[in-house]
Curated annotation (Swiss-Prot):
Keyword Ribonucleoprotein: yes
Native organism: Naegleria gruberi (Amoeba)
A GO term from the CC aspect: cytosolic small ribosomal subunit
Name this polypeptide is given: Small ribosomal subunit protein uS19
UniProt xrefs under InterPro entries: Ribosomal_uS19, Ribosomal_uS19_CS, Ribosomal_uS19_euk/arc, Ribosomal_uS19_SF
Biological process according to GO: ribosomal small subunit assembly; translation
Pfam families: Ribosomal_S19 (PF00203)
Lineage per the UniProt record: Eukaryota, Discoba, Heterolobosea, Tetramitia, Eutetramitia
Gene symbol of the encoding locus: RPS15
A GO molecular function held by the record: structural constituent of ribosome
Keyword presence, Zinc: no
Protein family per UniProt: Belongs to the universal ribosomal protein uS19 family.
Length: 120
């Protein structure tokens, strides 16, 4: 998927444009190269193997579309399949480092008003 630089600039925020303008470092380039290599060697119709990385601040570029990247979240790796809608976002946006809290019903000792909760 070939995109012109002007089209890419419209997808990125000003902060991302500044980061891209400085240039992509070697560690990001090697991640892109590994992901593209896995994508190109995968059999037709199958997902490529995940490329594991700790680079959560990597900006998703159009050349990464179709790749599967394992993003480290502190304990294990979360597989993220790169889609066109993800261009311009960071890998960390798709791999939460915490579990959202699911609040249950109050029980005895939770608050002073929980004394009115009927017991089983």
């Amino acid at each position: 998927m070939a995109m012109e630089n002007d089209e890419l600039k419209n997808l990125f925020t000003s902060a991302l444009r500044r980061i891209i303008g400085k240039g992509i470092s070697k560690k990001y380039k090697t991640l892109i190269e590994k992901a593209q290599k896995k994508r190109d060697t995968a059999p037709y119709g199958e997902k490529p193997d995940a490329v594991k990385t700790h680079l959560r601040d990597m900006i998703i570029l159009p050349s990464m579309i179709g790749c599967v990247i394992g993003v480290y979240q502190g304990k294990d790796y979360v597989s993220v399949e790169i889609k066109p809608e993800m261009v311009g976002m960071k890998l960390s946006d798709f791999s939460l480092t915490y579990r959202p809290v699911k609040h249950g019903k109050p029980s005895i000792g939770a608050t002073s008003s929980s004394g009115f909760v009927p017991l089983k």
